[in-house]
């Protein structure tokens, strides 16, 4: 997603021209935690 000249990852949304982490809740259990992007944002319901 184009966001103020930057491209947000799938784990981010554009808010006020900035890429921010998606805040979501998932009831899925991941023994190694959830997958994160290069910015430290968690991918929704995606195990690492």
From Swiss-Prot:
Secreted is among the record's keywords: yes
GO cellular component terms, A-Z: extracellular region
Pfam families xrefs: Antistasin (PF02822)
Domain Antistasin-like intervals: 19-47
Keywords attached to this entry: Disulfide bond, Protease inhibitor, Secreted, Serine protease inhibitor
Cited Gene3D superfamilies: Antistasin, domain 1 (2.10.22.10)
Subcellular location: Secreted
Molecular function via GO: serine-type endopeptidase inhibitor activity
Site, Reactive bond: residue positions: 27-28
Coiled coil spans: none
Disulfide bonds: 3-14, 8-19, 21-41, 26-45, 30-47
Top-rank taxon, per record: Eukaryota
Function of the protein: Inhibits plasma and tissue kallikrein, and trypsin. May be involved in leech hematophagia.
Family statement: Belongs to the protease inhibitor I15 (antistasin) family.
Name of the protein in its database record: Piguamerin
Biological classification of the source: Eukaryota, Metazoa, Spiralia, Lophotrochozoa, Annelida
């Amino acid at each position: 997603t184009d966001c103020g000249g930057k491209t947000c990852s799938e784990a981010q949304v554009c808010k006020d021209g900035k890429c921010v982490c998606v805040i979501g809740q998932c009831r899925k259990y991941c023994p190694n935690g959830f997958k994160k992007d290069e910015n430290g944002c968690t991918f929704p319901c995606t195990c690492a």
